[in-house]
Each structure stands twice: as structure tokens, then as C-alpha cells.
Amino acid sequence: MSIASVASVFKGEHAVGSQVTVRGWVRTRRDSKAGISFLAVYDGSCFDPIQGVLPNSLANYNDDVLKLTAGCSVVMTGEVVASPGAGQAFELQVTEIVVTGFVDDPDTYPMSAKRHSIEHLRELAHLRPRTNIIGAVARVRNCLSQAIHRFYHQEGFIWVSTPLITASDCEGAGEMFRVSTLDMENLPRTAEGKVDYDKDFFGKESFLTVSGQLNAETYACALSKVYTFGPTFRAENSNTTRHLAEFWMVEPEVAFATLDDAAELAEKMLKFAFSAVLEERMDDLNFFNERVDKTVIERLQAFVSSDFAQVDYTDAVEILKNCGKKFEFAVEWGIDLQSEHERYLAEEHFKAPVVVKNYPKDIKAFYMRLNDDGKTVAAMDVLAPGIGEIIGGAQREERLDVLDARLAEMDLSQEDYWWYRDLRRYGTVPHSGFGLGFERLVSYVTGVNNIRDVIPFPRAPRSASF
């Protein structure tokens, strides 16, 4: 007797006539007048549940089977047979069923068979993986994650685990969560009356990281090609569909690489990841295409087969100013492009993914390489039809004198970045990288447009339950 996942049965890995045991949870139960019950049982291995056919001759039919409701957990053993009904190739003729857990008071079970709004499900984050939509999101998220690791492994990258606790602000934005063990009711003070962080756990002011990039650069400048993939944190008080306080980032860094090299890597990575989802998770994509966004599959297929367009920021501004479209936010050189501008470029002008390069230095971070014009930096954003910016990257400033000047311009302390400056003092090299917000990627692939629904336990302003 073999333990079988529902997915393995549907893939034909167990011959018709073989005996298998399937373990999972009841989605629905239907009883026929002929004394047969039909259970739809899922185990999370694929989108569709398997149908178990249970005759009333089972020893516990009256005591257990007829009491089964949505959410009950069961272990079914039986024979794999070809399904006479439409919708699935195989079902299970059950010869034994063990109920491992009933649902207390089925009438109040929050995940009953009726459809719930996705907003309501956010309040039940511990139970929402049991729904079709969140289960499908979880499988797609896993597929994308595995594909990204596979891609970088095949490309010869080394995965580096960067710290979550840091004293550096990569973005220079200041929107960071403080990490402290000080007694909030009795804070130690300096002679000037400021909080004395010398008495804190790390002996200095410390924060949750906003990016693993700076740390990854140190390893790229020794191991050539590295990437990080982990959680990052922003104390940005934004209650929008696009913002989380805790989210995951994919951040590759490559030594001896230019901005164009980074753009090429980004295109290659995205196409690899999307191809993996199209190949491995079509059952879930069909659900999203039918219930969430009817363009999901077509959009991914078009993305994979598209050549990326490239345009300088300065030229992009001219395109937007002369397109004849009225935008909510006016366009002029020196502004950061808004989502509406990004989407116009990708969806209406280029009708393809587009890399916008060479942004004004005043709207970009201190570590981005200053171009020869003295006004722009070697930065890029990858814009995707349907969502806008999906990746942000840059060639890093490898010249110590220029880096120091940028730190001074932005009122950042050389002392705080002494170790980052050392990379420019000891065998400096041109190097480039980018950051991909992983939840934004999952949102793009699934069509689920609220970022809080594509991460298991969303963290946002006034939201830290579970």
C-alpha cells in the first residue's frame, strides 16, 4: 500500500487498479440515493481535489462518512480507477476511511463551501490556505521561488544569507524599524538627553534591514556572482494594495558587470521564472485565468516571447509629455515616474516589457554610479505590462571619491559606511545588481492585485496578527 498525493494520482504515477492511500481534507460531500457518498478531498499538492467513492457497505459509513463536512481531515485507502465523469481522469474507489479530525460545529466553520470575499479571508490568515485562491497562490509562489533559486544556481551564482539586523540604511530613506532591547519605560539617556544606544544590545542604534544589497556587494567583490533572497522591512505608513511592511526581495550582485549586463540578467531571470510557472502550474493558472484575471496566461506567454525594449529616462519623459494622454501626475524631467507613466510606456507605447535607464541622480540612491553628464546615474527600472515597475537596479558607484561626494550630498556619514567604502579602497571593480520585490512578482503572475493576498501572513500598518 503506497501513500499517494492527489497530484501523483492525477499525473498517472499510480496504475489503474493499484491500491493507494490518500490523506487530506474534505472540500465537499455528496450523497446519492443509491447509498453511495462522493467526497472531494484535497491535500494541497495540486489545484483539483480527488473524488473518493464511498459505498454504504463501509463499516463506519453511518457513524463517520455521513457526518463528514467541509474541513474534516481523512485518510482514504482504495483502488485507483478511471473516472467515468468529466473533469478528472482518475478517482478512488474507497475500501477504508479513517477520520482523523471532525470540524467542531460545521455551521460556524469559517471556511465552509460558500465563497468568501478575499478581504474577509485576510482576517482569517490561519485558515485561508484552505481556500482555492490562497492555496493556488501558495503553489505558484513556491514554484517561482524554486525557479529563481534554480536559475541562479544554473548561472553559477552563490546564494548569500545577508543579515536582517543592520546599522545601515541602504536606501537612505530612514523608514526603518528599530531593533532594541532597551526598557521603553526607563530609557537610558546621554548627557544631552538623547537615548543612549551604547547601553543597547548591539551598543549602537540598530534596525531591521531594508535591503540585503550592500552586504551582497561585499560578497560579489570576492565571489563574482552572488544573490540574496530573503525578507526585508520598510516602516512606510502606506495602506495601499502595493505596500507591505515585511516583504521578500531577490537581489543579485555581479562583479565586473555594467548596467546593460544587469538588464540582460533581469530579462533572462524573469523569462525563466515565468516559463517554469507556465510549465509546472498550469492547473493553478487556469483557475486565476478563469476567476481572477482573464489575461494571466496570455500575459505570461507574451512576456516570455517578447524582446525587452530599452529607453533612456530623458527620452521616456519626452514620450510621455508628447503622447497626448492626460496623466494624474504631470510629467517633467526630474520626477520619479509614477505607476500610470510606467504602465503607459509598457502597455501603450512599447507594448512590451521595457527597461528605463539613466535616471536623474537627485531621485536615486547614493550608491548608484554617476554618469559622465554629472546629472544622471546608471540606474534602471524594468517595467512590465499590467503592473509597471517590477525590478529596480543600478550599476554601483565603484569610485571612492565619487561615492564620498554622493554621501556628503545626501548628508550620510562616511563613518556609518566605512566597510562599504573599503570595497572601493581594496581592489575596486565595476559591479551591478538589482532588486526584485518577490510579492509584486507573485501578484503579476497570479493577477491577484492586492499584495497582502500573495504573502502568507501580511504585515502592514496596524496589522501584525497571527
Curated annotation (Swiss-Prot):
Family as reported in the entry's similarity comment: Belongs to the class-II aminoacyl-tRNA synthetase family.
Disulfide bridge map: none
Subcellular location per the Swiss-Prot or TrEMBL entry: Cytoplasm
Reaction(s) catalysed by this chain's protein: tRNA(Asn) + L-asparagine + ATP = L-asparaginyl-tRNA(Asn) + AMP + diphosphate + H(+)
One term under GO cellular component: cytoplasm
InterPro entries: Aa-tRNA-synt_II (IPR004364), aa-tRNA-synth_II (IPR006195), aa-tRNA-synth_II/BPL/LPL (IPR045864), Asn-tRNA-ligase (IPR004522), Asp/Asn-tRNA-synth_IIb (IPR002312), NA-bd_OB-fold (IPR012340), NA-bd_OB_tRNA (IPR004365)
Family matches, as Pfam families: tRNA-synt_2, tRNA_anti-codon
MF terms (GO), sorted A to Z: asparagine-tRNA ligase activity; ATP binding; nucleic acid binding
Full protein name: Asparagine--tRNA ligase
Protein's organism: Shewanella frigidimarina (strain NCIMB 400)
EC class of the enzyme, as a word: ligase
Keyword tags: Aminoacyl-tRNA synthetase, ATP-binding, Cytoplasm, Ligase, Nucleotide-binding, Protein biosynthesis
EC number in record: 6.1.1.22
Main location as per UniProt: cytoplasm
GO BP term (any one): asparaginyl-tRNA aminoacylation
